[in-house]
């Protein structure tokens, strides 16, 4: 019987398409560091949900210093007026970690290729009661237009408010899930609607790992 694995975990590691999103050094208190990292991610995703955050990278080289890199489409929402919101975020993270906090905000230039952005956008549009078919097709068209080699989207739940839940999927291009060298990004989001929760899954195939590394060198 076939077993499903998260495409991101399947491709994370040295010489693979993805790297770890959290890097820390710990001896016996690894679980404490992990719990604090989860709290930091929850604070950022909750307080700045409208910033359309695509990725959060956390580097914790020592107990005294922590670096948080936030990638988002609307960086102004995170920074706030005169940097007031980002200072507040630093204070909240410092309370959790008891360390010196450095925050780097980076703007995503092509959000249509970011799996998290696509999933969040679809979920928000479903909450506004837009047609799930139009929303999914529009997202696929925008992603392919920006250079994606393939994209697959699945929405599950009471689509359109029907009584019986079902799943609808749309796909364009190639999404080779069994090819490890393929740089496939995966994200999941939930749309909280009046008739229930709708799950949104997104797979985006960008390129092969060799091609992506050549582009990084350039």
Curated annotation (Swiss-Prot):
GO terms for molecular function: mRNA binding; rRNA binding; structural constituent of ribosome. Binds the lower part of the 30S subunit head. Binds mRNA in the 70S ribosome, positioning it for translation. PANTHER family: 30S/40S RIBOSOMAL PROTEIN S3, SMALL RIBOSOMAL SUBUNIT PROTEIN US3C. InterPro entries: KH_dom-like_a/b, KH_dom_type_2, KH_sf_prok-type, Ribosomal_S3_C_sf, Ribosomal_uS3_bac-typ, Ribosomal_uS3_C. GO terms for cellular component: cytosolic small ribosomal subunit. It comes from the Bacteria. One of its GO terms (biological process) is translation. Keywords: Ribonucleoprotein, Ribosomal protein, RNA-binding, rRNA-binding. Belongs to the universal ribosomal protein uS3 family. This is Small ribosomal subunit protein uS3. The gene is rpsC. Residues 40-109 form the KH type-2 domain. SUPFAM superfamilies: Prokaryotic type KH domain (KH-domain type II) (SSF54814), Ribosomal protein S3 C-terminal domain (SSF54821). The keyword RNA-binding applies. Pfam families: KH_2, Ribosomal_S3_C. Part of the 30S ribosomal subunit. Forms a tight complex with proteins S10 and S14.
């Amino acid at each position: 019987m076939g077993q499903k694995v998260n495409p991101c975990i399947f491709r994370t590691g040295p010489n693979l398409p993805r790297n770890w999103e959290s890097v820390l050094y710990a001896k016996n208190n690894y679980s404490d560091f992990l719990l604090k990292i989860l709290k930091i991610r929850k604070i950022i995703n909750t307080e700045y949900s409208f910033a359309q955050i695509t990725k959060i990278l956390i580097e914790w080289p020592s107990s005294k210093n922590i670096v948080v890199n936030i990638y988002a489409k609307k960086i102004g929402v995170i920074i706030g007026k005169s940097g007031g919101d980002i200072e507040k975020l630093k204070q909240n993270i410092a309370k959790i970690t008891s360390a010196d906090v450095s925050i780097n905000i980076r703007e995503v230039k092509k959000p249509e290729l970011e799996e998290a952005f696509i999933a969040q956008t679809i979920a928000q549009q479903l909450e506004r009661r837009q047609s799930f078919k139009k929303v999914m097709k529009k997202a696929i068209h925008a992603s392919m237009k920006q250079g994606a080699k393939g994209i697959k989207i699945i929405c599950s739940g009471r689509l359109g408010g029907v009584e019986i839940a079902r799943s609808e999927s749309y796909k364009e291009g190639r999404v080779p899930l069994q090819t490890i060298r393929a740089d496939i990004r995966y994200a999941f989001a939930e749309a909280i609607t009046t008739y229930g929760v709708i799950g949104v899954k997104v797979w985006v195939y960008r390129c092969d790992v060799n091609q992506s590394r050549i582009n990084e060198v350039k």
